[in-house]
Amino acid sequence: MEKAAKKEAVESLNGLFKTTSVAVVAHYSGLTVAQMQKLRSQMKLAGASVKVSKNRLAKIALEGTDVVAIGSLLKGPTVIATSNDPVAAPKVAVEFAKANEKFVILGGSMGTTVLNVDGVKALASLPSLDELRAKLVGLLVAPATKIAQLTTAPASKLARVVQAYASKDEAA
């Protein structure tokens, strides 16, 4: 890799690390190309990205970012998964690690907080931002629905009583 290409790679990685809220570091040694493609596509569907680069270049790119602490995890063949949603990258990485034993999660970072393997797994178990929004909307809509049911209930009960009385008169 030429010096200009290295500089461009470092700048690209640095921009990615500055804009990301969470990063997950894992070893990928022994994975096939098809498995790596599957990981990339799953990450892309979740709104996350996967980067494989030289560890030395990644460590340089980490300088001046919130996730600088993950530099100590960059040893051996590593992959870095990043996302703006704090749950997306960890969730996909943990699910992929369960299916592929050669994909080993080393740790990660959320903002300036360094996460060990258990921290990444705990983050992955949380609901995503979209799921939380859906639950919040459900909680906000539920009282309005109940109020609407309560206000229409007396009228419908009265209508049923009148209907029953009318059918009783017709039968007699």
From Swiss-Prot:
Say yes or no: keyword Nucleus present: no
Q: Name one GO biological process term.
A: translation
- Please name the SUPFAM superfamilies in this protein's record: Ribosomal protein L10-like
Output the PROSITE patterns linked to this UniProt entry. Answer: RIBOSOMAL_L10 (PS01109)
- Which HAMAP family does the record cross-reference, listed alphabetically? Ribosomal_uL10 (MF_00362)
Q: State the UniProt keywords alphabetically.
A: Ribonucleoprotein, Ribosomal protein, RNA-binding, rRNA-binding
CDD domains named among the record's database cross-references: Ribosomal_L10
Family in the record? Belongs to the universal ribosomal protein uL10 family.
NCBIfam families assigned: PRK00099.1-1
The species this protein was found in: Rhodopseudomonas palustris (strain BisA53)
Q: Which InterPro entries match?
A: Ribosomal_uL10, Ribosomal_uL10-like_sf, Ribosomal_uL10_bac, Ribosomal_uL10_bac_type, Ribosomal_uL10_CS_bac
Q: Which PANTHER family match?
A: 39S RIBOSOMAL PROTEIN L10, MITOCHONDRIAL (PTHR11560)
Q: Subunit structure of this entry?
A: Part of the ribosomal stalk of the 50S ribosomal subunit. The N-terminus interacts with L11 and the large rRNA to form the base of the stalk. The C-terminus forms an elongated spine to which L12 dimers bind in a sequential fashion forming a multimeric L10(L12)X complex.
Molecular function (GO) terms listed?
Answer: large ribosomal subunit rRNA binding; structural constituent of ribosome
Q: What is this protein called?
A: Large ribosomal subunit protein uL10
Q: State the protein's purpose.
A: Forms part of the ribosomal stalk, playing a central role in the interaction of the ribosome with GTP-bound translation factors.
One GO CC term of this entry? large ribosomal subunit
